[in-house]
């Protein structure tokens, strides 16, 4: 076999390999393009399904609201008609209406009204209770100067002559607070203001954090922070 024959035979073989590789590349690219088209169609279909579900839910909700409005209007109309009938017959409508109430209904109504009244007063009661506790706490921290008290008491008894006017002249002068008492009052006010500002800053810091998983997680983390701050 000559070189020309071998060359003629070899060229077609190389050409066939190129054609095969090209067809392989084309088939892979076609498949990728087809997958991309299917993926887009799937996404569009899911989007349309969600929109249709939302529209259906919205329509059902609107129908439910309209149905409730119609039922309420119907009940009001029936109640008004019963009231007019009672007036024409000369009956007491309120008394007649109460006949349909059972003992359980009356107990539920009384319980509901009592709870409503407690809720309205709870805010003022809580604030008053907090103020009372703070006042008692400050009083418990005060130190009584018995020595000064005894001195003032002895001075009053020594100058006491049975005349109420003279006693009234002595008491205002003797009850003047000392510089130490005045400084202690100022210090207590400053400490109370600092505590109040600290609580406000802590509350602002808590509101700034939005990374809590849920309310239970928030309470747990705040409790840990308080323990670390106290330690």
Curated annotation (Swiss-Prot):
Parts forming coiled coils: 30-89
Source superkingdom: Eukaryota
Biased composition range(s): Polar residues: 151-168, 211-224
UniProt cross-references to InterPro entries, sorted A to Z: mRNA_splic_SYF2 (IPR013260)
Record's keyword annotation contains Nucleus: yes
Region (Disordered) location: 1-30, 144-231
Locations listed in the record: Nucleus
Keywords per UniProt: Coiled coil, mRNA processing, mRNA splicing, Nucleus, Spliceosome
GO cellular component, one term: Prp19 complex
Annotated GO biological process: mRNA processing; RNA splicing
Subunit description: Associated with the spliceosome.
Family membership noted in the UniProt record: Belongs to the SYF2 family.
Known function: Involved in pre-mRNA splicing.
Protein name per the record: Pre-mRNA-splicing factor SYF2
Organism expressing this protein natively: Debaryomyces hansenii (strain ATCC 36239 / CBS 767 / BCRC 21394 / JCM 1990 / NBRC 0083 / IGC 2968) (Yeast)
Gene this protein is translated from: SYF2
């Amino acid at each position: 076999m000559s070189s020309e024959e071998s060359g003629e035979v070899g060229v077609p073989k190389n050409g066939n390999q190129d054609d095969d590789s090209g067809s392989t590349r084309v088939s892979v690219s076609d498949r990728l393009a087809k997958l991309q088209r299917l993926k887009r169609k799937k996404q569009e279909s899911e989007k349309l399904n969600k929109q249709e579900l939302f529209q259906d839910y919205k329509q059902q909700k609107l129908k439910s609201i309209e149905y409730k409005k119609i039922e309420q209007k119907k009940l009001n109309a029936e109640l008004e008609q019963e009231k007019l009938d009672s007036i024409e017959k000369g009956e007491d409508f309120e008394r007649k209406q109460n006949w349909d109430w059972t003992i359980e209904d009356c107990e539920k109504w009384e319980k509901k009204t009592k709870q409503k009244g407690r809720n309205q007063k709870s805010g003022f009661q809580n604030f008053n209770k907090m103020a009372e506790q703070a006042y008692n706490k400050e009083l418990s921290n005060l130190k009584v100067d018995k020595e000064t008290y005894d001195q003032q008491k002895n001075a009053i008894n020594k100058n006491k002559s049975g005349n109420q006017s003279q006693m009234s002249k002595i008491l205002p002068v003797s009850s003047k607070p000392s510089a130490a008492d005045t400084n202690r009052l100022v210090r207590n006010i400053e400490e109370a203001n600092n505590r109040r500002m600290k609580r406000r800053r802590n509350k602002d810091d808590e509101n700034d954090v939005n990374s809590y998983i849920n309310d239970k997680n928030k309470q747990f983390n705040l409790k840990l922070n308080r323990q670390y701050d106290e330690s």
